């Protein structure tokens, strides 16, 4: 039997797998157990009471976290004319049309978010097989296909997170870094949960928020007592 690492032993000793922790206690645990030599991200998994096999129960969208994600986000924008100037002024690193598409086709993808104005989708549509598998394809539901590209760039830079249910009906995303203040992580999580509640499909029955767990990049999941997130519910 393989020996447990020091970190794995610590997690086993500290984390009760059947317990739902007060959000403040959960964050304190993550901070205590974050022993990696880099600043770990704090990730969240939200189990939703939806049937992901039904298209009308897929939950997808985006929300801006009040304290951002702690990541520097590079943004590429497909647009032209005055919108191109506005996107550049808003802070987009890459702006263009066919020439930007050529870069993507050549494998030059030094960006984290792709935004497009509606008139640029004829160009972006050719890149579906490249951008789609990487989760970068612009979509109106996440605010990344929009006539107001400047606002979308600002949102991306401000810490907007995009979310989508996976095949098991679970949302996975990031709510910050482990060196954030506890209240910042709590408020970011509340903002995400609030957005998910608003996005509840009309056809979803029963309990919608089934389980909320937070973890660090290298750590175990800690279940959160939803009653301590009452502000968002």
Swiss-Prot record:
It comes from the Bacteria. One of its GO terms (biological process) is regulation of translation. This is Large ribosomal subunit protein uL1. Binds directly to 23S rRNA. The L1 stalk is quite mobile in the ribosome, and is involved in E site tRNA release. Protein L1 is also a translational repressor protein, it controls the translation of the L11 operon by binding to its mRNA. It comes from Shewanella woodyi (strain ATCC 51908 / MS32). GO terms for molecular function: rRNA binding; structural constituent of ribosome; tRNA binding. One of its GO terms (cellular component) is cytosolic large ribosomal subunit. Keywords: Repressor, Ribonucleoprotein, Ribosomal protein, RNA-binding, rRNA-binding, Translation regulation, tRNA-binding. Part of the 50S ribosomal subunit. Belongs to the universal ribosomal protein uL1 family. InterPro entries: Ribosom_uL1_bac-type (IPR005878), Ribosomal_uL1 (IPR002143), Ribosomal_uL1-like (IPR023674), Ribosomal_uL1/biogenesis (IPR028364), Ribosomal_uL1_3-a/b-sand (IPR016095), Ribosomal_uL1_CS (IPR023673).
């Amino acid at each position: 039997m393989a020996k447990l690492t020091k970190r794995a032993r610590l997690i086993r000793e500290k984390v009760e797998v059947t317990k739902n922790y007060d959000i403040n206690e959960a964050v304190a645990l993550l901070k205590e157990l974050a022993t990696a030599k880099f600043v770990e991200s704090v990730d969240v998994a939200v189990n939703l009471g939806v049937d992901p096999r039904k298209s009308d129960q897929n939950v997808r969208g985006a929300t801006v976290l009040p304290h951002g994600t702690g990541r520097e986000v590079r943004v590429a924008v497909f647009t032209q004319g005055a919108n191109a100037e506005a996107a550049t002024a808003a802070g987009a690193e890459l702006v263009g049309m066919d020439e930007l598409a050529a870069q993507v086709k050549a494998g030059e993808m030094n960006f984290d978010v792709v935004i497009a104005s509606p008139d640029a989708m004829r160009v972006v549509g050719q890149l579906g097989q490249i951008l789609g598998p990487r989760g970068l394809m612009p979509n109106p539901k996440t605010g990344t296909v929009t006539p107001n590209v400047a606002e979308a760039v600002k949102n991306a830079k401000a810490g907007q997170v995009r979310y989508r249910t996976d095949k098991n009906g679970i949302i996975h995303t990031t709510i910050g870094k482990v060196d954030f203040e506890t209240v910042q992580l709590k408020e970011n999580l509340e903002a995400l949960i609030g957005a998910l509640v608003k996005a509840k499909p009309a056809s979803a029955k029963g309990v919608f928020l089934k389980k909320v767990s937070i973890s660090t990049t290298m750590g175990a999941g800690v279940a959160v007592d939803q009653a301590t997130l009452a502000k968002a519910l």
